[in-house]
Amino acid sequence: MIKVNTGGGKTIDGLVILQSYLNEGLGPALYVTPGGGYMETQLLDEAHNLGIAVVTDPDDAKYLRSEAIAVVNTHKLFNGRTVFSEKRVSAPMAPIGSVVIDDAHAALSTLHQTLSLSIPSSSNVFIPVIDLFEEDLKQQSADSLADIREGNYESALLSVPFWAIRHKADRLRELLRSEATKYGSSLYWPWPAVQEVLAICRIVITSREIAITPPCPPIGHVTAFSQAKRRIYLTATLSDDSVLVTDFGALPESVAKPITPLTAGDIGERMILAPQEINPAVSGDEIRKEVAALSRSYNTVVVVPSAPSRSRWAAYADEAPTTNEQIVAVVKRMKSGVHVGLVVLTNRYDGIDLPQDACRVLVLDGLPGSFSGDERLQSLLTSRESGVDDRQVQRIEQGIGRGVRSNEDHCVVILIGPRLAKLTIDPRTLKRFSPATQAQLELSRTVTTSMGAKPIGEIMDTAKQALSRDSDWVRLAKSKLHGIAPQPGFVSQFAAPLRHAFDAAVMGGFVTAAKLLADAVEAEDDVKLKGWLRQQHAIYLDQIDPSQAQDVLRVARTENTHTLRPLSALTIRTIATSDDQADTCARRLTTMFASGSSAIRLGFEEMLDDLKFDPARTEEFEAALLQLGLVLGFESQRPENEIGEGPDNLWSLGEGQYWVIEAKSGATSTKIGKRDAAQLAVAELWFKKRYADTCTGLPVMIHPANTLYKDATAPVGAKALTEAGLKQLTDNVRAFSVSVAVVDRTRSEVIGRLLADHKLNANDLASYLAPIRG
C-alpha cells in the first residue's frame, strides 16, 4: 500500500510503478481507476504526458504481451461476469500480473455495487421476493413492512432474518435466476458472483429496492486479481485502512506498513472553517450567501450529499452539472483559467482534481449520506457509541482534498451544518482524520478561537486573509505542517477476522468462520460494534447450530438495537420518572454534551437538525426525538425499534403522565390516513396493557396535519404535533440551549428556571399540541 496526501501525485506513482513491473517481466499490468468517464480521461492524458503506453481493452494484444498498461475502471474489473474470471464464458480469462488500484477507498462504492444485487421496485421479482419473506418480515416489524408495501415512507427499511435466508435460499435463487439472465437487468452483471454465496448474504428491503449483499465482496470470483503477483493500493493518507482488508482482501500486515512520504505535511495549504462551530447561531443560508459573494472573485466548488441539498444552492449556482459529460466540461473550463463562479456537485467527494485557480473556495454542505437501504442500515449498525461512522469521516477527508492538488496549492474549505462542525471539534472524530488534516483543523480553530459569536461577515473576513495571501497566515500555515510524521496504516482488530471468516464460509468452513467472529467479539470494547460483530457471528453459527445462533443474537440485540430481532419475544422495561425534571435535565446536560458553550450549542443543533419533516430521514427523526426527551429531563424509549411493537416513542413526563407517540415525520399528505390513525390506536392499546391504571398515556401523532380523512378514526383525546407545533417546540429548545450554554448547568435550580422560561416543563408541553379532528 502506498499512502500519499490528496494531491500528492498518486496517479503518476501508479503508472511509473506498473511500467517498472513490465520492465521486470511481471506483466500484464493493469491500472484500475475508481470510476470511468472523467477519471479515466485524466489518467490517459497523464500517461500520454509521461510517454507511457496505455490501452483501454484488457483483450488488446499489447496488454497481453505486456507492451502496454491496460486502464480500466473498477466496474470492469470487479463484477460477476468480469473478463478477469476463470469462469469467463466467451473467451479465455484476461490475466493480471501486476495491478494498481488507484484511490482504493474511492473505488469501494463501485466494488459494493458490482458485487451485490440491487432489485428496483420496478423489477418483476421485487414483490415476489417480499412475498417469499412476508411472515419473517412481519416478525421484525409489521408496520415497516406495510410502509414498504405501500411506498408511503421512503426511509422505511427491513432486514430479512438470516435464518429465513438460509431456509429459503433455493427458492430465492429460483426467483432471481430468470431475471439475472436478462441482459440489461440490474442483476445481470453481479449475479454469477453473488449467487455463489446467496445463503449467507444480508437482504435489506426498502420501498425503492431490495439489496442483497455478501458479508464481504466475493473478490475470489475475480480469479486474475486474486492470483496477481503484485497488488498495489494507492490511497490518500486516511486514518483507517481496514476496508482494504475486508473488501479487497489485502494482507493486514502489508496495509499496516504502508509506503509513505517522508513527511505527512507535504499537503497543500488549507484553511478549514466551520462557521457554525465558531457561532452556532449562524444559519446555513447566511453562509451560502457569503460563499456566493466569494464566488464572484474566486472559482468555488460546493459538494452536497444529495439532490435535495443541491436545491438549497439553486439561487446561487452558476453551474450544477449532474452527468459525467457535464462535469468533465465544467472542470475543463475551470482548469483552463476561466472564471466559472459557483459550481455545485452532488455526492462527488472523490475523483475530481481542481488545482490552483480552478478552485480556491471549496464547500462541503452537509454530512455525506448513505443512500441505499443497505448503506443506511450498515451505517446505523457500525456507528460507534460516539455516533461516528468511519466511512463518513473518510469521505469528508476525500472531499476537502479536491481543492489542493500539490504542496504549493492553497484553498479555503468551508463546512456547513452542525454535524460537520461537531466532527471537527469532537476529539473522538478529530483523531480519525489524517495527521495533516488534524493539524489544519486545529490551526483554523486557533485562528478563530478569539472570534466568539461574531457575525458571519467577520468570520468570512478570516477566509479572505487566506485568499488574499496574507503573509502572517501563509507563514503560520506552513509552520503548522512542518515535521508532521506520517502515520502507519491502521487496521481495526476485527477487519482480518471478518475477511477470513467470509473466505472460510465460502469454502464451507462455517465452524472456522463462527470461531473467528466469536474471538473478534471478545476483543472489541465498543458496545455497539460488539453487538454488530456478534450478529455476524450468529449468521455463520446459524449454518451449523441455529438454536445457539438465536442465543447469540439475543445478546447482540441488547448491545445494538439495530441488529435483527431474535425469534423469541423480546421484553422492554417499563419507564417512570421519579426524579425532579430539573435535576435530571441538569445531570444529562453534563453527561450528554461535551463541555464548552460551542459544544453544547452544536450538540443541540445536531439534534434539532434531525427534528424536521423529511421522508428520507424518519429514523434520524425518531432517534432525535428520543434524545430530546432525555435532554429535557424525561424518561424516553423507542419500543417499536427495540422490540418490534408499541409506539415509535414513549415519553414519561412524571406523575404518571406519558406521551404515546407515533412519529410520521415522513408524511406528505394533507390529512391523517386510516392506517396511521389505526397505528396510533394500537400504540395506545399496547400502553394500556403494560402500564397500571394509575398511568395516563396521551396518544400523540407527529404529522403535518391534525385533520383525519373521512375513513380514519383516532383514539379519543388524541393530539397532533404538527409542523407549526414542532417549530414552536424546537425554537424554544434552541433558545433554551443558548441560555444553557452560558450558565452553570450543574445547578438544577438554574436549569429549572430556564425550563420554565422556555415553556419546556412537563406541564407546558401540551401547549404545542393540536386536537386531532375528524
Describe each model-derived feature in a short phrase.
Residues 40-92, 325, 329-334:
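Inter-Walker segment of RecA-like/P-loop motor cores
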Residues 1-5, 95-98, 103-298, 305-313, ...:
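Conserved coupling segment at the C-terminus of the helicase ATP-binding
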